[in-house]
């Protein structure tokens, strides 16, 4: 089994009793979550300290960008409604808005990038991958230098990590991998598209992303409140 360590980015520690003891699988996944509230690391620590809550995460990022640790990386947290995932994933609860799309503040997202870089580096990984689909991600066997992103919504009827973060999972993977490789600028596959006559969000997603149902990612990425778009409007398109 791996030699485990914990992140030096954590400035607050309150270890939760809610965990399964040492992992049965080496770390090769990271699972970001949304808290559904602009909570502090102390609030998360208090929540996870209660045995009746039956929940915990390895780390949490408070609304101010501070990092808390609640379950050491060597141990499996109770976070993603799935034993197999949490045995191999470092789980991170992130302060968010209390309603859809559960947006993160800049301080939280930027710290998430930094924390993912640290987790990957300490666990010998040079690439963070977002494979997009549940089937592909859960059936993928990572190379020894690879870490895979997973999400709570694959294991429970939840939005988690929220539409805001879900639309940015590819960006997160690219930014982390770029920092791990020492690149000055993170590689991004995000592009733009100018709306034409007859377009709809569904049609654009089907044509550019290969799946019309991914229109929600375009909607979230552009901060659209409705499905209405206008000819000439420039839309940001997420990575394919």
Tell where the protein language model's regions lie, with residue ranges.
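N-terminal catalytic cores of peptidoglycan-degrading enzymes
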Residues: 1-86
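Primarily a LysM-type cell-wall glycan-binding module
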Residues: 186-210, 233
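Short acidic beta-strand-loop surface patches of small beta-rich interaction domains
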Residues: 219-228
């Amino acid at each position: 089994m791996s030699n485990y360590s914990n992140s030096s980015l954590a400035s607050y520690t309150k270890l939760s009793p809610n965990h399964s003891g040492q992992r049965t699988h080496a770390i090769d996944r990271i699972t970001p979550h949304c808290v559904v509230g602009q909570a502090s690391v102390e609030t998360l620590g208090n929540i996870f300290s209660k045995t009746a809550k039956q929940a915990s995460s390895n780390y949490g990022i408070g609304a101010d960008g501070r990092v808390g640790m609640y379950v050491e990386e060597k141990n499996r947290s109770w976070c993603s409604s799935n034993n197999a995932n949490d045995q191999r994933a470092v789980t991170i609860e992130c302060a968010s808005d209390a309603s859809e799309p559960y947006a993160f503040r800049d301080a939280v997202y930027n710290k998430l990038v930094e924390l993912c870089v640290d987790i990957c580096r300490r666990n010998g990984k040079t690439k963070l991958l977002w494979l997009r689909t549940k089937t592909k991600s859960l059936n993928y066997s990572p190379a020894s230098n690879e870490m895979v992103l997973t999400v709570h919504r694959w294991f429970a009827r939840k939005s988690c990590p929220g539409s805001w973060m879900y639309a940015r999972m590819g960006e997160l993977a690219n930014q982390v991998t770029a920092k791990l490789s020492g690149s000055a600028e993170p590689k991004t596959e995000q592009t733009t598209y100018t709306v034409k006559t007859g377009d709809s969000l569904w049609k654009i997603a089907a044509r550019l992303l290969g799946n019309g149902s991914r229109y929600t990612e375009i909607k979230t990425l552009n901060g659209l409140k409705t499905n209405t778009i206008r000819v000439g409007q420039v839309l940001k398109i997420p990575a394919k």
